[in-house]
Amino acid sequence: MKVELYNHIVRNGLTRRTMLKGAASTAALAAMGGAVPALADGHSALRAAIMKIPGVGMGSPGDAEWQKVGEMCLGPVKDRVKPGEFKGVELTFMGLNNQNLHNFLFRGFLKPWEAYTGAKINWIDLAQADYNPRLQQSIATKTVDFDIIEMGAPFEGDTAGQGLLNEMPDWVKDQIDYDDLVGYLQPPVGTWDGKAYRINIDGDCHTFCYRTDYFGSGSITGRANPPKTWQEVNQISKDVDGKKDPLTGLPAHGFLDPLKGWGGFGMYFLTDRAGPYVKHPDDPAFLFDIDTMKPRINNPGWVQAIQDVMDLIKIDGAYPADQINADPGTTGFQQFLAGTGSMLTWWGDIGSNARTNDSSVIGDVVGFSMIPGSDKVYNSKKGAWENTYNEAPNNAYLGWGVYVTNRVEGDSKKRKAAWSAAAHIGGKDISLWTSAYPSGFQPYRNSHFVYDEWEAAGYDRAFIEDYLGSNLDTYNHPNSLNEPRIPGIFQYYSVAEDELAKGFAGQYSSAQETADAIAAAWEKITDSIGRESQIKLYKASMGL
């Protein structure tokens, strides 16, 4: 969650949030085209109680709080499972250990579940950079050694498409209130061939994080407001070179591009830059041509994004020293939170740590907005640039979900136990808590946007409207980037990272040559998987 991240967010222009200031009705949100929040139901007392654990301003929660919330939210489990019903069942759960969250939270939430049901859970904890290789190994060998997995929707083509997942029972849909999702996470996301597999636990999007003390009267940028376009971002990065950071007194830096790969996940950060250049409002595609799967990664829009990064690499001091070895974990947690640099894009984790992480020094000088746009966009259909402002925020990774694998098939007791555990950590009430406190997960249910629940818990009304609205701005943007759930998507991303690293290190002569190398590698991946099947799945993933 990102509640502690800031007291105020600087945003320019008329947005959904500024129009909603002081609005009390959910109808106001609906009129703006956003998701209509589901009103609090019979669990309102429980929801109010868990929202006060540990309470506003009482510090970052830990295992004791996670276990308490898990215990308080056991009601739906007890309605469907008898005490000790799963005694003797052992389950293996594979997930992340990022920033001591993810699996750490799940352990806490599930300890009361284990005590009640009698089941035992064994854990496979993975760092972000190790996640894709570990999963791809299981996919390639079809040797799945886990019963439950924390996984993003982009991998559904690799897993559900190959029969590695177990279909969600109807009773689970009832327990988790399956339909309570913001629009972009509704099916077909989480489904394959009409069958449901995913319990949503997150709603991913990248937002723009910036240092408010770099802007305003007397600031080192000389600009009143943060940038609205990537062209401005690069210019600011050049302008602050050689100046002193107003907070630390160390060298000032502009945008923090991660120049080192991150197990395929680093591709999302180049996509942040490229999106407004390449995602034309009249074209649903941005990675491949729809009818041929021909890569677009080497078209003028993508090349411009790569060139923007290379332009900053050429300027000694534009980036911190040794940026070539900085992955997104470095840029977010070792640089930006520690006071190095003034701008970056990231998931909500940065916000949730800005005021709760002991290593953060920027809590009072951090602001957030939607990812910058561009003053031009490349029209792939016409093969020409159009000099018009364009926005294309990035719903990067489509959020984390929890899935049950085919290892449980043939054992009804184990299958029920696995789905019960998954449903518990993806439940409606527990998800409100993960949205409201540091967890690594962003709001994703319509019911998360009931402002009164947050205000009753002690959060400032204006802040909550601003914070939740910043997610809706991206989720509901008509030109947002929603990646295709096709087999091999992270093979494409990983090889792109490899070639980008070569380009950023000067091993290729230009941005175009770098992009051409990625495109050639992507063509080989498509042919190895099967072009015709990829075209079919690519179209299906875009609803065509």
What would you call each of these model-derived segments?
Residues 1-18, 25-32:
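N-terminal secretory signal peptides
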Residues 52-85, 152-207, 236, 269, ...:
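Hinge/lid segment of periplasmic solute-binding proteins
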Residues 92, 192-201, 206, 231-294, ...:
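Extracytoplasmic/periplasmic solute-binding protein
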Residues 48, 87-98, 119-124, 148:
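Short, well-ordered beta-strand elements
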Residues 234-239, 283-324, 370-374:
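Glycine-centered hinge/linker elements that transmit conformational signals in sensory
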Residues 46-50, 61, 75-80, 90, ...:
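Long, aromatic- and glycine/proline-rich binding clefts that accommodate carbohydrate-like moieties
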Residues 108-184, 213-228, 334-335, 342-343, ...:
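Extracytoplasmic "Venus flytrap"/periplasmic binding protein-like
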Residues 189, 218-221, 315, 359-443:
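Extracytoplasmic/periplasmic substrate-recognition and gating elements
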